[in-house]
Design a protein with these regions (language model features):
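N-terminal pre-domains immediately preceding structured catalytic cores
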Residues: 2-204
Length: 204
């Protein structure tokens, strides 16, 4: 699909949704295109999730994704949130906006787009759910009618880096924890604003 057609498709999806999103024209499934078939780098210990002080004006039970902080914040109470480390979009795949969780899947399957397979010919046409090299990992939260997801990963060493094609990538154990907390319909705000959230005295 050409870039203009992708742009038109993205605009059509946004117009059909009840939520405003500003996005670059890019296939959004969160896959680091050069992982499949490449040697895996030495993995560093996974950064943990932790409770932070969060702006008191935000009501609980909503998600803020800060691409600047490379954190996903699940607001648990006024002034408190759980901060999870994420991999953020590449510069050419950046987007911001407000969406809602439209569906949830355990062990989602993955179908790479034609452009992804052109960029990386090693990609298969389809990866079943539960496969150890499924880029969506063990859980996925689908955002509105877009291609954006909050999901796990088969490449945990990419967490903390700007590598995805638009999706919000998390460690599998973190997205599994988030999955059990977040119902369908949850508001998700994606932004490049930094919240500079700090750990409180007591940890989660």
């Amino acid at each position: 699909m050409s870039v203009p057609r992708l742009r038109r498709a993205a605009l059509a999806l946004a117009a059909a949704s009840a939520f405003a999103v500003t996005a670059q024209p890019a296939a959004a499934q969160g896959f680091f295109l050069f992982d499949w078939g490449s040697p895996q780098p030495t993995q560093q210990p996974a950064a943990d999730a932790y409770v932070v002080r969060f702006p008191h004006r935000f009501a609980p039970r909503q998600i803020f994704v800060s691409f600047a902080d490379r954190k996903l914040y699940w607001v648990t109470a006024r002034g408190r949130a759980i901060a999870y480390p994420i991999a953020s979009p590449r510069a050419q795949s950046s987007w911001t906006g407000v969406l809602r969780v439209s569906q949830k899947k355990v062990n989602p399957s993955w179908t790479p787009t034609a452009s992804m397979r052109r960029e990386n010919p090693r990609l298969p046409a389809f990866v079943p759910g539960g496969h150890p090299q499924n880029p969506l990992g063990n859980r996925a939260l689908y955002l509105g009618s877009t291609l954006y997801r909050i999901h796990g990963t088969d490449a945990p060493w990419t967490i903390g880096r700007p590598v995805s094609k638009g999706c919000v990538r998390m460690h599998n154990h973190h997205v599994a924890d988030l999955y059990r907390r977040v119902p369908v319909g949850t508001k998700v705000t994606a932004t490049y604003k930094s919240f500079r959230a700090r750990k409180p005295a007591a940890y989660w």
